[in-house]
C-alpha cells in the first residue's frame, strides 16, 4: 500500500523535467510505498513542454502532474540582464499559486491516509522553501547538475559574506574552491555571475541551499570522488546524496523531432564502422554564428572523419556552409536538425562527441563510454568543461571559457586537432578513462552500488523506514 507522497517542483524546461521524471521513477522502483506529484509552472518560450508531458504521462502510472495556473502578471525576459534573474523572478511570483496547490494536496491526501513527506525542488525553485516553511514540510533540493557546481555555490555564499562585488569578466583571478583539486579560473564561472542581477539571483540561491534538509546531486562518487567526499565530510552543510547519473535511457522523442529523419540517421549509423563517427551537438539554446558554422565545416573537412552534425534550420542558412561542402562530404557526413541524442550516443558507430557540455549531455556520454570534446556555450557549461578536462581528465579540451555571445572565433585547425585527438582509438588516455568510468557508473546505479545506496539513504531519511 502506498502511503507516502513527495511533491516535486522542477524548473519548467525539458532539460530539467527529464531528470526529475527519471529520479521519480528510480525512487518508486526502489520503494513502492512512494508516489510523486509534479507541479508544472509556465515559462516563456517553453510551449512544447505540454506536448512532452502528455507523451510521457501514460508511462509513469505512479506520477501525477498538476499544472500551476499561469501568472496574471508575467515578467518579460528582456527586462533583465540575465536569464537566471528572469527565471528567479518567475519562480518567486509562482509561490502563492504553488502554496495553494500544496495545501489542497495535503488536505485531499490526508483523507486517504497518505502523508506528504516533503517538497523536492529544482535549483531555480529554491525560493519555494517559503512554501515548505509555511506548512512545516521538509525541503529537499534535486540538483540536476554535478557536485562541483554545488561546491561553487557553497563557495559563492561564503565569498558574498566577505565580498559582495560581481565577478569581473576576462579577469585572470584564480579561485580556491573547497571541493575542487585545482584552482578554478573565474573565467569559467556561470555567465550570470558577471552581471548584477544574475549575481544577485545566484547569491540568493546559494544561501537558500544552506537551509535545505538535504541536497541530491545528479552525479556519483565514481565521477566526482573528491567533491562528493568533500560534502560527506562537511559538518555545517545539508546532507548531500550523490544519486546519479540520472537520465532517461529510453529518451522520449522531442516534440519537434522528425521521426522519419530519425530512422534515416539511425540507418546511416548502422552502416558505419565501430567508433568511426564524431557527433556534434550544441544543445537546444545555442545559436551558432555563420562564421562559426563555416569553421566547423572546414574543421570536419580537414579531419576527414565521418560525422553527424546536429544543426537546426534556424541556426544556419545555405550561405553559412562553405560552397560545395555538402557535395564533398556526401556519404561521409550527415547534417540533421533535432537529433535523438541518447540513441546516437548509445550507437556503436559513435566514437566521439563535440558538446556544449550541458550536464545531461555529459552524463549520457559517460554512461555510453563516448569521450567528449568541450565547447561550452552558456549557463554553467564553462564550469562543467573545466571540471571534465582539468579536474576529472574525462574530456578533450577545445574550449573551456567560450561563451555563445562572444566575438571569439574558434578556427578550423583547432576543431580538427581536437576531433583527431578524441577519435584516436590508440593510446588515447581520455578514451580509456571514459570507458572505465562508464562501467563504474553503470554498476553504481545497481543494487549494492554507491548511487543506489545514496537513494536508499535518502528514502530512509525521508520516510524513517528502510526500503
Curated annotation (Swiss-Prot):
Residues binding an anthocyanidin, per UniProt: 16, 379
Stated family: Belongs to the UDP-glycosyltransferase family.
- Record protein name field: UDP-glycosyltransferase 71D1
Active site (UniProt): 16 (proton acceptor), 122 (charge relay)
Q: Which PANTHER family match?
A: GLYCOSYLTRANSFERASE (PTHR48048:SF45)
Name a GO molecular-function annotation: flavonol 3-O-glucosyltransferase activity
EC number(s) in its UniProt entry? 2.4.1.-, 2.4.1.91
Q: Known catalysed reaction(s)? A: a flavonol + UDP-alpha-D-glucose = a flavonol 3-O-beta-D-glucoside + UDP + H(+)
Q: Where does UDP-alpha-D-glucose bind?
A: 144, 341, 356, 359-361, 364, 380-381
Give one Pfam hit by family name: UDPGT
Q: Which keywords fit this entry according to its UniProt record?
A: Glycosyltransferase, Transferase
Give the InterPro entries listed for this entry.
UDP-glycosyltransf_plant (IPR050481), UDP_glucos_trans (IPR002213), UDP_glycos_trans_CS (IPR035595)
- Tell me, in a sentence or two, what this protein's role is: Possesses quercetin 3-O-glucosyltransferase activity in vitro.
Amino acid at each position: 500500500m502506498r502511503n507516502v507522497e513527495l511533491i516535486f517542483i522542477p524548473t519548467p524546461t525539458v532539460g530539467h523535467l527529464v531528470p526529475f521524471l527519471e529520479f521519480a521513477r528510480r525512487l518508486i522502483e526502489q520503494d513502492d510505498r512512494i508516489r510523486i506529484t509534479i507541479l508544472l509552472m509556465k515559462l516563456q518560450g517553453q510551449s512544447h513542454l505540454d506536448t512532452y508531458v502528455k507523451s510521457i504521462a501514460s508511462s509513469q502510472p505512479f506520477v501525477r502532474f498538476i499544472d500551476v495556473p499561469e501568472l496574471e502578471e508575467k515578467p518579460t525576459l528582456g527586462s533583465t540582464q540575465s536569464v537566471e534573474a528572469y527565471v528567479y523572478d518567475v519562480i518567486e511570483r509562482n509561490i502563492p499559486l504553488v502554496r495553494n496547490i500544496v495545501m489542497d494536496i495535503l488536505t485531499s491526501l490526508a483523507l486517504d491516509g497518505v502523508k506528504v513527506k516533503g517538497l523536492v525542488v529544482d535549483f531555480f525553485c529554491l525560493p519555494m522553501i517559503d512554501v515548505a516553511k509555511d506548512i512545516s514540510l521538509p525541503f529537499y533540493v534535486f540538483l540536476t547538475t554535478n557536485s562541483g557546481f554545488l561546491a561553487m555555490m557553497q563557495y559563492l555564499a561564503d565569498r558574498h559574506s566577505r565580498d559582495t562585488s560581481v565577478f569581473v569578466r576576462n579577469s585572470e583571478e584564480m579561485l580556491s574552491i573547497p571541493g575542487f583539486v585545482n584552482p578554478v579560473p573565474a573565467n569559467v564561472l556561470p555567465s550570470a555571475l558577471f552581471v548584477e542581477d544574475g549575481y544577485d539571483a545566484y547569491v540568493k540561491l546559494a544561501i537558500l541551499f544552506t537551509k535545505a534538509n538535504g541536497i541530491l546531486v545528479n552525479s556519483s562518487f565514481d565521477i566526482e570522488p573528491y567533491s562528493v567526499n568533500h560534502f560527506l565530510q562537511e559538518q555545517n552543510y545539508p546532507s548531500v546524496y550523490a544519486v546519479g547519473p540520472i537520465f532517461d535511457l529510453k529518451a522520449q522523442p522531442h516534440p519537434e523531432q522528425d521521426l522519419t529523419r530519425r530512422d534515416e540517421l539511425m540507418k546511416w549509423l548502422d552502416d558505419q564502422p565501430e567508433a568511426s563517427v564524431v557527433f556534434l551537438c550544441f544543445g537546444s539554446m545555442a545559436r551558432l554564428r555563420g562564421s562559426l558554422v563555416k569553421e566547423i565545416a572546414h574543421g570536419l573537412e580537414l579531419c576527414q572523419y565521418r560525422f553527424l552534425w546536429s544543426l537546426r534550420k534556424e541556426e544556419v542558412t545555405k550561405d553559412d556552409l562553405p560552397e560545395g561542402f555538402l557535395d564533398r562530404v556526401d556519404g561521409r557526413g550527415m547534417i540533421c536538425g533535432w537529433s535523438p541524442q541518447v540513441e546516437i550516443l548509445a550507437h556503436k558507430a559513435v566514437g566521439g562527441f563535440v558538446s556544449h557540455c550541458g550536464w545531461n549531455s555529459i552524463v549520457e556520454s559517460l554512461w555510453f563510454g563516448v569521450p567528449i570534446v568541450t565547447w561550452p556555450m552558456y549557463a554553467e557549461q564553462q564550469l562543467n568543461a573545466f571540471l571534465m578536462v582539468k579536474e576529472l581528465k574525462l574530456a578533450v579540451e577545445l574550449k573551456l571559457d567560450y561563451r555563445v555571445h562572444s566575438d571569439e572565433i574558434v578556427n578550423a585547425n583547432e576543431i580538427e586537432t581536437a576531433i583527431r585527438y578524441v577519435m584516436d582509438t590508440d593510446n588515447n588516455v581520455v578514451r580509456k578513462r571514459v570507458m572505465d568510468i562508464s562501467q563504474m557508473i553503470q554498476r553504481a546505479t545497481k543494487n549494492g552500488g554507491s548511487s543506489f545506496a545514496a537513494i536508499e539513504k535518502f528514502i530512509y531519511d525521508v520516510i524513517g523506514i528502510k526500503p
